[in-house]
């Protein structure tokens, strides 16, 4: 599904997008960026979904538990592995950043 949000780059693929976005909102995510093959519109049957998220205000343990729950729920919904992080090492970020897509939360 592709979104028509005016501030988003076209060409990304996020299976079950509306449901995934609701899971992220329910987990307290305030900002989410999709990166990797899904962000490039190159999703295959075996591709995972990669998210960089921000969850301001949550205590570290609570944030971790909310992320784990959201990750599990998205995996169950999409049938794909999900990688979710609150930060990336500088080298990985530099590689992923050009393809990142801001999701409309």
Descriptions of predicted regions:
Residues 24, 49-52:
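Generic leucine side-chain signal with a strong bias for well-ordered alpha-helical environments
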